[in-house]
Amino acid sequence: MMLPQNRFNFTPNKQRRRAKILKILVLLAGSAAAFAGGTALYRLGLRYVSSSDAVDHKTIRLLWEEKNYGEIIRVTDSILKKNPMDPHALVFNGFANFYTGVNQTSAEDKIFYIDAAVKSLRRAKLHSRPPLRGEADYILGKSYYHKGLHYADLSARYMLDSIQEKYIGQDSYEYLGLAFSSLGEYGESLKYFLKAGENNPSDLLFLTLAQTYYQLGDKASSEEYLMRAVNKSQDPLLTEKARFLLGDIYFQNKEYIKSEEQYLKVLEMNPQSPDTHFHLGEVYAALGDGVKARAYYRRALRIDPNHFGALRRLYN
């Protein structure tokens, strides 16, 4: 059975500090989703829809073909009122709640549906041989990732279980990379991001690989993947993040002219970035141009009067 793939890759809508860069995906949450359906899910999934009620059975088949998740929730809820442990109703209830949840704009609504998905799928797994076991673990892994940082271990656990059950989604390795990154296990994270890149070498994945190498202290590899991201991407926000990190790497390597070039390109895309003005100030200070450095610190403060770095440079 193939579930809808790569539907929830996210691009943040504002620049964050380096310490938070790895949260891009799926970023993940609070940003626009990029959708790509997997129609094989609906063909193969129909073989597993089952109910003692033939009408309910037919209804779920039709709703699944139509991707009508709201009605699937309603119908399976009705089945579960009569038989709370119906494994097929639990599985499809979980799937439908998950796909409904990730499309919510309200965080409260999103968590409501995600929690319902987890509840149904965990109950389905109480059966010795639940239907669609690998697919259920896959959706559980994604659900726990979307529940937040404190559930990253469970996200990794269930995604690994789904792979062990011979189900590998197009984004399985990306979710594993994200989960291990959230756990601070960057070596494991890198392993799965590289596997993801074998099949889906996207600009976002290149950026994520660059960030992971950066966290591991491998600046040369980080630079390589940042340049790949810049050359491939048509997304200005992603390009901005890649160039900002390139500027930081060049600064650490004392390649100040290269660093200046990247930060100036960031300002062309986002002239109201206080961090970029501040880092340009740092570049000019390192080059011995104190007047220009202070000018950029002041620009950072005009945009963000509480910018800690600029305040420290100007008033300490």
Question: What are the functions of these language-model segments?
Answer:
Residues E65, Y99, N103, H146-G148, ...:
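Register position in tetratricopeptide repeats
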Residues K82, H127-R129, E165, E198-N199, ...:
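Structural marker of alpha-solenoid helical repeat scaffolds
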Residues T76, I114, L121, Y158-L160, ...:
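Hydrophobic/aromatic packing residues within the alpha-helices of TPR/SEL1-like helical repeat arrays
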